[in-house]
Amino acid sequence: MKLAINGFGRIGRNVFKIAFERGIDIVAINDLTDPKTLAHLLKYDSTFGVYNKKVESRDGAIVVDGREIKIIAERDPKNLPWAKLGIDVVIESTGVFSSATSDKGGYLDHVNHAGAKKVILTVPAKDEIKTIVLGVNDHDINSDLKAVSNASCTTNCLAPLAKVLHESFGIEQGLMTTVHAYTNDQRILDLPHSDLRRARAAALSIIPTSTGAAKAVGLVLPELKGKLNGTSMRVPVPTGSIVDLTVQLKKKDVTKEEINSVLRKASETPELKGILGYTEDPIVSSDIKGNSHSSIVDGLETMVLENGFAKILSWYDNEFGYSTRVVDLAQKLVK
């Protein structure tokens, strides 16, 4: 597989490291930043530490352990040389091109104009597109798909959890809160932002904000469409988040032990192994930094009241876990 990455930010760099480790041929990176800066940010990471590879830069390229990766700086995806480079999959990780087409360019330009075979969005799409959450609706992957969304990191955490709960006990309705690490779509000091809460200093407050993650579960689990909603609390950590899911279950006499047993067993199935994790260790968010699971159930925090009213908490590394799924999806798309 020949891979290209469009946008070399937090997700783009993590995708690079995971793909590089698997021996995937990363042909090119498109980013408006110069190669020297891109190489430095790949090597030195405040969250995950120093990259254990030799990283250098040269004119128009970065070199990682002797392998040269072409650096392009093109604003319009229509003009990217994907056909010439023989690109199989583009990872669209700028966060900018979430519509198929627009005056500034769209994600389909990678395929329809630039000549790549397929494109994966690392954000929820703003229009109709196949959304895939691995472990949940992998069966929807087929060779005809040209563009897919890997959904959001929070949907990747929530959907496997909701799937297991719904199949085992039936979900009537539910509400989710993600206690989420801050991201680049917040200000580090008070500055204007279209979301006035995200305008406030990210490391100094708990910041309530919106998320479409719960509603998006309906895209990958149609039977739960309209049954889940949620919100987000951004907190002062750079990575490591947790979903707090409260559900009304159809099974009214369910117990904490039943829920935990079902989730633990599900985490060991071929379908969900490596995607859904389970722990009863008293962990904190820093303990799941660099964890490649989409969702790690915290069995100690499961609660049940009468009449099937339950709360389940599940951790996720919103950067590394999500980026791992992006690479998994790319490999599945070209099989």
Curated annotation (Swiss-Prot):
The lineage of its organism: Bacteria, Pseudomonadati, Spirochaetota, Spirochaetia, Spirochaetales. It catalyses: D-glyceraldehyde 3-phosphate + phosphate + NAD(+) = (2R)-3-phospho-glyceroyl phosphate + NADH + H(+). Belongs to the glyceraldehyde-3-phosphate dehydrogenase family. Signal peptide: none annotated. GO terms for biological process: glucose metabolic process; glycolytic process. Catalyzes the oxidative phosphorylation of glyceraldehyde 3-phosphate (G3P) to 1,3-bisphosphoglycerate (BPG) using the cofactor NAD. The first reaction step involves the formation of a hemiacetal intermediate between G3P and a cysteine residue, and this hemiacetal intermediate is then oxidized to a thioester, with concomitant reduction of NAD to NADH. The reduced NADH is then exchanged with the second NAD, and the thioester is attacked by a nucleophilic inorganic phosphate to produce BPG. Its EC number is 1.2.1.12. The record marks H180 as: Activates thiol group during catalysis. It comes from Borreliella burgdorferi (strain ATCC 35210 / DSM 4680 / CIP 102532 / B31) (Borrelia burgdorferi). NAD(+) binds at R10, I11, D31, R75, T122, N184, N318. The keyword Cytoplasm applies. One of its GO terms (cellular component) is cytosol. It is found in: Cytoplasm. The gene is gap. This is Glyceraldehyde-3-phosphate dehydrogenase.
